[in-house]
Design a protein with these regions (language model features):
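Bacterial Sec-dependent N-terminal signal peptides
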Residues: 1-31
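Lipid interaction determinants
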Residues: 24-88, 92-146
Length: 146
């Protein structure tokens, strides 16, 4: 006969192992995004009348580099139509959702990392200034940090 205390200890050990596995798995998911990412393309659909679609690929006038760090900070810098820009902020992931907050400007998007490519899907609701948009951005990992 197995003593009840041994059952409790075994059950507790199993629960601790499952908890540890869950924590490590969550950290592993976040680590997919850690690294340096270079902009490749953006395709946007503008729900105007008529609907418009535009695509832009990386060139000397359209560049961006995102750097995600393990401590939850990120930075970006780039060039858009000859104008340089840069900022820093905080990032977090929850399942397939990436949240970036740079100076109070929050971007929430779906993300997927497949090999050395990261895809960000951004949905923006219509406002007084802008039409509703759906954008897909692709970035390539510059330095594999996994």
């Amino acid at each position: 006969m197995v003593h009840p205390m041994k059952k409790t200890i075994a059950y507790t050990n199993i629960c601790l192992l499952l908890l540890l596995f869950g924590i490590l798995n969550a950290q592993n998911d976040k680590s997919k995004i850690v690294g340096i990412w270079e902009f490749q393309t953006i395709t946007s659909i503008y729900y105007s009348d008529p609907q418009e679609t535009s695509s832009t690929s990386r060139d000397e006038n359209h560049q961006e580099t995102l750097t995600f760090r393990e401590d939850g900070t990120f930075s970006y810098h780039g060039v858009d139509e000859g104008s340089k820009y840069a900022s820093i902020g905080l990032w977090n992931t929850e399942k397939e959702t990436l949240t970036m907050d740079a100076g109070g400007v929050k971007t929430i998007c779906d993300y997927e990392v497949t090999g050395e490519m990261m895809t960000l899907t951004v949905r923006e609701e219509e406002s007084e200034e802008f039409y509703r948009t759906f954008s897909v951005l692709k970035y390539k990992n510059k330095i594999i940090s996994r």
